[in-house]
Amino acid sequence: MAHKKAGGSSRNGRDSRSKRLGIKKYGGEYVSSGNILVRQRGTKFHPGENVKCGKDYTLYSIIEGIVKFKKRGKLKKKYISVIKLNNLNKKLQNRQISIKY
């Protein structure tokens, strides 16, 4: 007869892999068509000009250009836009936007 009680097995020791969410391209960065700008759960960021939203709320660029972050509306929702390079030069000349490099 055994004099030691059998040790129980642990039920710990597992964890899920991280989902790598967050901003992938920041304001002022150059992006090409199809580049992922943000991976998110829900709409923390909303699509602006030249940006589309995937079925998992991923925001991606539909043209090549420069990324621009904006807050709009009463609730100050965050929008991400991509500005075409030739439009960017005109807007910079008219001082409508500022870009940090």
Curated annotation (Swiss-Prot):
One of its GO terms (molecular function) is structural constituent of ribosome. Residues 1-21 are annotated as: Disordered. InterPro entries: Ribosomal_bL27 (IPR001684), Ribosomal_bL27_CS (IPR018261). GO terms for biological process: translation. Keywords: Ribonucleoprotein, Ribosomal protein. It comes from the Bacteria. GO terms for cellular component: cytosolic large ribosomal subunit. Gene3D superfamilies: 2.40.50.100. Belongs to the bacterial ribosomal protein bL27 family. This is Large ribosomal subunit protein bL27. It comes from Buchnera aphidicola subsp. Cinara cedri (strain Cc). The gene is rpmA.
